[in-house]
Curated annotation (Swiss-Prot):
Function as written in the Swiss-Prot or TrEMBL entry: Confers a modal distribution of chain length on the O-antigen component of lipopolysaccharide (LPS). Gives rise to a reduced number of short chain molecules and increases in numbers of longer molecules.
Assigned protein family: Belongs to the WzzB/Cld/Rol family.
Annotated Pfam families: Wzz (PF02706)
Major site of localization recorded for this protein: membrane
Record bears the keyword Cell cycle: no
Protein name (Swiss-Prot/TrEMBL): Chain length determinant protein
Species the sequence originates in: Shigella dysenteriae
InterPro entries noted in UniProt: Bact_polysacc_biosynth/exp, LPS_length_determ_N_term
S-S bridge residues: none
Protein's gene: wzzB
């Protein structure tokens, strides 16, 4: 019984062993076909590597500008808005926000070109607005680094131009408001002067009618509009001449307004050097390209060539066996 079982077991496994051996024999006999297929695949892979565009990614990290970088801008805002000037921290957030928006707009424009360019900006740390990671994909390592630095500078210049334009518009508006305020105060001061002269002239008429030529009071502080004629016609005539040649009287706010106007007029916006960002890490020079990967490409070529060659050998032998039957 033991011998019969062994024979049965041998009968069950021999076909599989023979098939596997036969398969290996077929592949060995067709090894030249497989080798040629692998060589062809490697040649195609080398050709692909020769013509494929390389991709190198340069990366930089930016954040909001330092206080010193926006000192001139902050001073200009103080001159224009005075006590209503935003906090320095608010200005920093505004500037980096404008930089981010302008950079995103540029990235979208480059992506929609006939030959798209990949420029990206995103937070460096998840769930945190700052710092920001910006990157550019180029065909060479040096080109990617140079292009990224160029686009960062381009966006910074654009934001700078926009800020200068905003400042000039605000300066023009502030100048107009201050000039209007000065004119209003001057008109009020002139009206007060004219009113004072008319009041004295009216008192002079009363004094002449009452034939009061000399002062009738000892303390001028006690004189009111109704009793002004008691100063006498001689004093009133002298007062009219004095008031007519006397300069307009202004409040301290008038002179403060004039000072503010002079400060705004002396403000030189074109001389401001405003930066909307600060480097945490300057554009890197990539040392490894993103694609194509030579090693992976060649390994895949060998595997694919071997599989294709094996398929050709097995398929050809199967077709021969079928025709023989």
């Amino acid at each position: 019984m033991r011998v019969e079982n062994n024979n049965v077991s041998g009968q069950n496994h021999d076909p599989e062993q023979i098939d596997l051996i036969d398969l290996l024999v077929q592949l060995w006999r067709g090894k030249m076909t497989i080798i040629i297929s692998v060589i062809v695949a490697i040649a195609l892979a080398i050709g692909y590597l020769a013509v494929a565009k390389e991709k190198w990614t340069s990366t930089a990290i930016v954040t909001q500008p330092d206080v010193g970088q926006i000192a001139g801008y902050n001073n200009a805002m103080n001159v224009i808005y005075g006590q209503a000037t935003p906090k320095v921290s608010d200005l920093q957030e505004t500037l980096i926000g404008r930089f981010s928006s302008a950079f995103s707009a540029l990235a979208e424009t480059l992506d929609n070109q006939e030959e798209p360019e990949k420029l990206t900006i995103e937070p460096s740390v998840k769930n945190q607005q700052l710092p920001l990671t910006v990157s550019y994909v180029g065909q060479t390592a040096e080109g990617a680094q140079m292009k990224l630095a160029q686009y960062i500078q381009q966006v910074d210049d654009k934001v700078n131009q926009e800020l200068e334009k905003d400042l000039k518009d605000n300066i023009a508006l502030g100048r107009k408001n201050l000039q209007d305020s000065l004119r209003t105060q001057e008109v009020v001061a002139q009206e007060q002067k004219d009113l004072r002269i008319r009041q004295i002239q009216e008192a002079l008429q009363y004094a002449n009618q009452a034939q009061v030529t000399k002062p009738q009071v000892q303390q001028t502080e006690d004189v009111t509009q109704d009793t002004l004629f008691l100063l006498g016609s001689e004093a009133l005539e002298s007062m009219i001449k004095h008031e007519a040649t006397r300069p307009l009287v202004f409040s301290p706010s008038y002179y403060q307004t004039r000072q503010n106007l002079l400060d705004i007029e002396n403000l030189k916006v074109d001389d401001l050097d405003i930066h909307a960002y600060r480097y945490v890490m300057k554009p890197t020079l990539p040392i490894r390209r993103d694609s194509p990967k030579k090693a992976i490409t060649l390994i895949l070529a060998v595997l694919l060539g071997g599989m294709v060659g094996a398929g050709i050998v097995l398929g050809r032998n199967a077709l021969r066996n079928y025709n023989a039957k």
